[in-house]
Amino acid sequence: MAKHGFKMIDAEMHVMEPVDLWERYIDPEFKDRAPRRLNERRWDIRTVVEGQVMASMPGGDWPALSDAEEKALGDRYAEAIARGFDPESQVRAMDKEGLDLAILYPTSAMYITAFDTMDPRFAEAACRAYNDWLHDYIQAGDPGRIFGAAAVSPHDVPTAVAEARRAVGSLGMKAVFLRPNIYNGRPWHDPAYDPLWAACQELDVPVGFHETTGSRMKAAGADRFKSLGIAHISTHSVEQMLA
């Protein structure tokens, strides 16, 4: 699949997590609080974290897809849907797109640390569970072609450092994933995060920032637009630049 001697790499390919990921993988201490992805309609990425329904617009629910959107997505992802978005479907999608390698980012797990005042231990447990699942997912697919970006929780920097070390050293992750939003009043240039940046530098892995619309974090433009499309354009582009 290499073209003109260059490998084709997708640096941000998303997974569709199973609805019971955290129920199966989270530390038993937190099982009664486990995040869960809703499955009440097709393409449901809404995720419940500590009673908060993420992927919802201010003052309302995440809008349902139109019939045309349903058909377009259904046609495009027919094979993956039939396989339940399993690891094999991820690899087959890469084959169709002519990709040699891909770094996998989350969908539902984008929301598992996404509001202030979270219990830091719970947030860390949710990240560990996702990383453990992603490792198993990659091993069941093609670990020579698909690689993971580990989720770490900014709610407690020492545990974020520890999880980055575990995810890279023990699980083979190739990047660390963070949301670009300000957590607990601390922008990313705050010296409190220096140990995390130092750990990533020592581990020789990049940090990837990725915004999602509809979280409980303050996001640029989220309070100005009722349209999902416009809010998405604003929050994703501006938050990335601000980070």
Please give the residue ranges for each predicted region.
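Helix-coil boundary/capping segments in enzymes
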Residues: 1-243
